[in-house]
């Protein structure tokens, strides 16, 4: 009997996770099936009860459930608690365990491009939502020199930067306009918002007029693969990191938690790229 895995979110019609995971099940000869379940917020508790009843072996959690899912799990690991969000759930002996692979998945994609030590990095994170919190938490763990949060709502950025502050990493908050004026002081800039995602591909989270060519510019969006934000950064001579690496890495880490098997990340990447027409 096939082992059932899935994705809980709303909406989920755009998700490429089923394609990626089902291909890996096939390649690794693992008797599993992954399905995306569209779950409205009011139905989340019932969906989790359904997952237990169906004896699902594990599932991913996406927008808008990453925070509220924590109320319905038996245990949440330390990093997910610190982040305040769960994106991966594993069933063990009838108990549901929550983890977060977003931050580590992103970190691994960033390490492919950032070659200087993390304690020398001054990072600007655009956005203050769940993805920003996952990334901020792992960057603090890596002891980056400073993290600045720029957000449309300054109060939210201030609250988040206060949570991140540590003895090794100084944290501050800026408005988007203030961040634009200080852009040249950052060595890494990360867009964690949905600004620039298909179909609004001409939008940018902020102006890159003051960007230094020494800066690494990263966007979590992977559709389109190269956002206008990344395109303009590249034109200014900066190194860029698209969102595909994080998407593949967080999926691969979840796959390992569920199955104990290590999927081929390059094949996962190619599978998603083909679907995106890349």
From Swiss-Prot:
Its EC number is 1.1.1.25. NADP(+) binds at residues 78, 127-131, 151-156, 220, 243. It comes from Halalkalibacterium halodurans (strain ATCC BAA-125 / DSM 18197 / FERM 7344 / JCM 9153 / C-125). InterPro entries: Aminoacid_DH-like_N_sf, NAD(P)-bd_dom_sf, SDH_C, Shikimate_DH, Shikimate_DH-bd_N, Shikimate_DH_fam, Shikm_DH/Glu-tRNA_Rdtase. Signal peptide: none annotated. Homodimer. Keywords: Amino-acid biosynthesis, Aromatic amino acid biosynthesis, NADP, Oxidoreductase. Shikimate binds at residues 15-17, 62, 87, 102, 222. GO terms for biological process: amino acid biosynthetic process; aromatic amino acid family biosynthetic process; chorismate biosynthetic process; shikimate metabolic process. The active site is at residue 66. Pathway: Metabolic intermediate biosynthesis; chorismate biosynthesis; chorismate from D-erythrose 4-phosphate and phosphoenolpyruvate: step 4/7. This is Shikimate dehydrogenase (NADP(+)). It is an enzyme of class 1 (oxidoreductase). The keyword Amino-acid biosynthesis applies.
């Amino acid at each position: 009997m096939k082992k059932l895995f899935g994705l809980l979110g709303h909406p989920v019609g755009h998700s490429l996770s089923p394609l990626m995971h089902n291909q890996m099940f096939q390649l690794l000869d693992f008797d599993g099936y992954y399905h995306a379940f569209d779950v409205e917020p009011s139905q989340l508790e019932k969906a989790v009860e359904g997952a237990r009843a169906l004896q699902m072996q594990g599932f991913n959690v996406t927008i808008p459930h990453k925070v509220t899912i924590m109320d319905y799990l038996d245990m949440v690991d330390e990093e997910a608690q610190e982040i305040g969000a769960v994106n991966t759930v594993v069933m063990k002996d009838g108990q549901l365990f929550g983890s977060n692979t977003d931050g580590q998945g992103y970190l691994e994609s960033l390490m492919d491009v950032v070659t200087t030590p993390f304690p020398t990095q001054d990072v600007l994170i655009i956005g203050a939502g769940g993805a920003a919190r996952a990334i901020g938490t792992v960057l603090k763990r890596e002891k980056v020199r400073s993290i600045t949060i720029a957000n449309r709502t300054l109060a939210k950025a201030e609250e988040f930067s206060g949570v991140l502050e540590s003895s090794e990493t100084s944290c501050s908050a800026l408005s988007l306009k203030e961040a634009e004026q200080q852009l040249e002081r950052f060595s890494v800039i990360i867009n964690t918002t949905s600004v620039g995602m298909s179909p609004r591909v001409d939008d940018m989270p902020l102006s890159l007029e003051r960007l230094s060519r020494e800066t690494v510019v990263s966007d979590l969006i992977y559709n389109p693969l190269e956002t206008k934000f990344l395109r303009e950064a590249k034109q200014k001579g900066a190194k860029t990191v698209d969102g595909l690496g994080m998407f593949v890495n967080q999926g691969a880490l979840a796959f390992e938690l569920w199955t104990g098997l290590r999927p081929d990340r390059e094949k996962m990447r190619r599978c998603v790229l083909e679907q995106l027409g890349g």
